Amino acid sequence: MSILEILYYPDKRLRTIADPVVAVSDDTNQIINDMFDTMYFKKGIGLAATQVNIHQQIIVIDLYKKNKQRLVFINPSITKKTGIISIPESCLSIPQIYEIVPRSEKITIQSLDQYGNKFEMEANNLLAICIQHEVDHLFGKLFIDHLSPLKIKKIHKKIKKLSKTFKKNQFPL
């Protein structure tokens, strides 16, 4: 079990556009396992490699947080979006901040699995939201980027206030 260090907003590395994975290898699978370990340790439901300073197009998701439905997406591409759903979102890279973000209610995604096999799947509701959130990370986008400038300003103030209650290495600014 290896817990990776999470990058915290406003770390500029979160804005890095991830490179596609050229070939799925044992190293790729070690990254995936470490990402799941990190996500479970931090009590998240999704994690993009960018959030742990690995700039490859890899996403892990488990909505149940208990190793029950481990999903891996390598080089994901959302090919279809329908409907709109808005629920509060949060992020392991922006702890304790929750904001309502409009997302597509249903999506179709094409990807590689952890073995390098191509697949396509449909997702809706929470899974669709989580996939969209994590895919955004791969392109340097955060959930707060979907908010108004006024809300972002309020979040910055809240983060500064929260950062005083965290140790510097847990939530650096």
Swiss-Prot record:
Residues that hold Fe cation according to the record: 91, 133, 137
Metal-binding found in the keyword field: yes
Cofactor binding, per record: Binds 1 Fe(2+) ion.
Protein biosynthesis listed as a keyword: yes
UniProt keyword terms in alphabetical order: Hydrolase, Iron, Metal-binding, Protein biosynthesis
Pfam families: Pep_deformylase (PF01327)
Cofactor(s) in the UniProt record: Fe(2+)
GO annotation, biological process: co-translational protein modification; translation
CDD domains: Pep_deformylase
Enzyme Commission numbers on file: 3.5.1.88
GO molecular-function term, one example from the UniProt record: peptide deformylase activity
SUPFAM superfamilies named among the record's database cross-references: Peptide deformylase
Catalytic residues of the enzyme: 134
Catalytic activity: N-terminal N-formyl-L-methionyl-[peptide] + H2O = N-terminal L-methionyl-[peptide] + formate
Free-text function comment from the UniProt entry: Removes the formyl group from the N-terminal Met of newly synthesized proteins. Requires at least a dipeptide for an efficient rate of reaction. N-terminal L-methionine is a prerequisite for activity but the enzyme has broad specificity at other positions.
Annotated family: Belongs to the polypeptide deformylase family.
Protein name (record): Peptide deformylase
Source species taxonomy: Bacteria, Pseudomonadati, Pseudomonadota, Gammaproteobacteria, Enterobacterales
Gene designation per UniProt: def
